[in-house]
Amino acid sequence: PRKAGRFIAQPEDSLALYPGFGQMILPAEPAETFTSINSYFIIDFDNDIFTGKDYYFTNGAQLSLIRPSFGNNLIARLLPSAGKGAMNHYGISIRQNMYTSTNPEQTEIDVNDRPFAGILLAELFKISTLHSRELCLTNRVQVGFIGETSLAAFIQRLAHHLFPVGWQFQIHDDLLVNLESSIEKQVISERNLRLSFSATGRLGTYLTTAGAGIHFKAGRIPLSFSPFATINSKTVEYEGNRHKLLWWVFGEAGETYTFYNASLQGGLFNRNSPLVIERRRLTRIVIQAA
């Protein structure tokens, strides 16, 4: 028999596409910040095909839309900005994550493996960039479900010729409510070189974590610190880059401490899942590099 293992909840890597389309005015907000009038549609796709495995975090997909009108509600207005003169982007997104065991075809529960889990989240977020201090503050409010309601098993059935039977043992339905805040500060900004540090905290019934990281870029980098670029020269966010073709290499490393992870430990309210991982068997500290 296998020895009892330890389980980690590792933030997933993303492949993101950022097609954008811009307008030409910049309305002012209260508190001397600004709302970007540019709009973006973002596709994030994560799959274990990139790592050559088919277990644990096995698939994730997210659709995001950024528009200035999403800032016209109470929740968005309550999210903090990076400071006086900050440029704010408001958006909504929907995300689904899938987690499977190392043997998805197993017909019995293996207490030494991780549980199957599906996550479905809707999100309102605000990305606030203070260019004068090269500071970016991102805040997210997330609401969703873990369990069969996430439709993870249904989607994987459509995608796989052989359906993983282990979904019958997935973590049961429960409500997820999460807050996430991250801050990134650029410390080196040269013509072809960037270095920044970041810190991230999550609190809620899905993930409760704290982490920090370092990020590096080198190449033909965009001139500004903005997380988004636009080709519309009639907006203040237009960079007027010295090169038509931008390219860069990047590297990053970080450490995360996990206090709670519903995809391993089960939902906070529904404690009837057939398999969960006890707290003492969790690896709390995760170190990542890319």
Each predicted region: which residue ranges?
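N-terminal ordered "arm"
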Residues: 33-77
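Long, hydrophobic/aromatic-enriched structural stretches that serve as scaffold segments
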Residues: 83-153
